[in-house]
């Protein structure tokens, strides 16, 4: 059985229908193809008036959008509360007095002994002294009668000698050096003063110099503002804190005594 070959409409203008009739298809198809090839579909061209209207409409639309965006309120930024930096309170302890050592005792002067004289055996010896002639004996005088001895008066008694003055008392021993009291926040665990809220908000800073009377037990009994910081709030905060402090009392030797100490307190905001 032969395989049917495809038929081109351009080469085969006739087609056999199932009923056996022949239909001429070549001419109508060729005319349609000719029209499509020589008359392609053309798009509709806008007129000048329509173009101007479209441009005006686009500009109006863009202007409305820009106006609407400009009327929108910018959202307010969130308020950030001011942050207070950490507070640094410095404590400066007064320098301890320098105890000068006693000067050394002067050494006794060394007395140099004169060297012994050197005897020169070869030196010329002096001539021996001449013998002294013996004196001639004088005639003995004749004894004369002696007068009677007078009575010897007794000597007056000697005045009593004054008693020797008593020996001066031995000088008292030198007193032991006095060590002033001190406040060391490092090992005494003294709490730092609280920074007043008003001074913190207004940025007040200053140094308060306190004069503290320390008992032998180490507790403060009296606090005086020796030099103010210029802010009453800072002065009161310093006095309030030092009332709770513990001090190293003054000592004379190994014995604790009452004493005064100066305590500077610095209030600084970093």
From Swiss-Prot:
Q: Which residues form the TonB C-terminal domain?
A: 180-270
Q: Name one Pfam family in it.
A: TonB_C
Which InterPro entries does the record match to this protein? TonB, TonB-dependent_transducer, TonB/TolA_C, TonB_C
Compartments (UniProt record): Cell inner membrane
**Annotated PROSITE patterns:** TONB_CTD (PS52015)
Residue segments, region Disordered: 80-187
Top-level lineage group? Bacteria
Q: How does it sit in the membrane?
A: Single-pass membrane protein
Sequence intervals crossing the membrane:
52-69
Q: Name one GO cellular component term.
A: plasma membrane protein complex
Enumerate the GO terms in the molecular function aspect. Answer: energy transducer activity
GO BP term, pick one: protein transport
- State where it is primarily located: membrane
Protein family: Belongs to the TonB family.
- The name this protein carries in UniProt is Protein tonB2
**Which gene carries the instructions for this protein?**
tonB2
